[in-house]
Design a protein with these regions (language model features):
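Helix-start/capping segments and mature chain N-termini
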Residues: 7-90, 115-295
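Short, glycine/charge-rich beta-strand/loop segments that flank catalytic centers
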Residues: 77-86, 98-112
């Protein structure tokens, strides 16, 4: 099937690979895609609701920057990629139109060799899918564990290499929790697949956007929201102890716009800046509803 969704039967889960669109279970990639044996690629993901891809330009900024940092010569313009992604949205008929849209590129399909393939002969591959997922409801509270951050030092690139996060999430599940707060030494970095921020004495505190954390779109939106509301913000590395003593601990991601963390390593945390937290949370949701043309 072509990238155009006209004539494509509405699907509960939609997949795409290099120009072919169809039911996700029927889409496959070659065994020699460099994503398979090297994880040689990058990705991005965001939420879809009401036929709108949320914060797409922000996600494109991050995706194209990841391609640049990995030296992947991604061949599609932003306009072309947007058209491809919206073809999935138009073909999607699952979960009342709500879902998570994921796309990734790899350095192409070639025999296994650590060296980059010849760019004149091998083009990057593009894979995408849209599947049902609900946003975390506003009232959901998260329980987490803490773990030493053993990831490499390119966390600002949204690469396909996520084994430390996979292992960490499994450990969280086995501990009866939903997420992990990483730390390097005694300094908090981020979470396995989310950002963490803090309300401390009326200020929104977050980790500086350096190579130790992913520049999360949701946290960036929350920072802008705080500034609009006159809430001070500060980029600062804080210790695990300072995090545990924060007035509020906040989790943000593409699937969790702004939620509370209420327990870390089975110890109750936060809950000391209720009014300010809900002010930020309500504003984050209002922005989402307006952007997706529901308000």
């Amino acid at each position: 099937r072509s990238t155009g969704s006209r004539g494509v039967k509405s699907m509960k889960e939609v997949g795409y690979y290099n120009g072919t669109i169809g039911p996700l279970s029927e889409i496959s990639c070659p065994i020699l895609d460099r994503a398979v044996y090297f994880g040689d690629g990058c990705y991005d993901a965001t939420y879809v609701q009401n036929g709108v891809i949320f914060a797409l330009e922000d996600h494109f900024d991050r995706f194209y920057n990841s391609c640049r940092l990995l030296r992947i010569p991604f061949q599609y313009s932003r306009e072309e990629l947007e058209k491809i992604l919206y073809s999935l949205v138009e073909a999607y008929d699952g979960n009342d139109g709500k879902g998570i849209l994921y796309w990734q590129t790899s350095r192409g399909t070639a025999l296994r060799n650590h060296l980059f393939p010849d760019e004149t002969e091998v083009k990057p591959n593009l894979m995408a899918f849209l599947m049902p997922m609900d946003l975390s409801p506003k009232e959901k509270e998260f329980h987490t564990i803490t773990l030493e951050d053993t990831r490499f030092l390119h966390c600002n690139i949204k690469t396909l290499n996520l084994i430390p996060s996979v292992i960490a999430n499994q450990k969280a599940k086995e501990a009866g929790c939903q997420e992990v707060i990483f730390h390097r030494g005694d300094r908090v970095t981020e979470m396995a697949h989310s950002n963490v921020s803090f309300l401390i004495d009326g200020t929104l505190v977050y980790h500086p956007f350096d190579n130790k954390v992913l520049p999360g779109i949701a946290i960036k939106h929350l920072i802008k929201t705080a500034e609009k509301l006159g809430v001070p913000t500060r980029a600062e590395e804080i210790t695990v102890t300072e995090a545990m003593n924060a007035d509020e601990l906040i989790i943000t991601s593409s699937g969790t716009l702004c939620n509370r963390i209420t327990e870390v390593d089975k110890i109750p945390v936060g809950g000391k800046a209720d009014e300010l937290f809900h002010k930020l949370q309500d504003a984050a949701w209002d922005e989402f509803m307006v952007y997706t043309k529901q308000k």
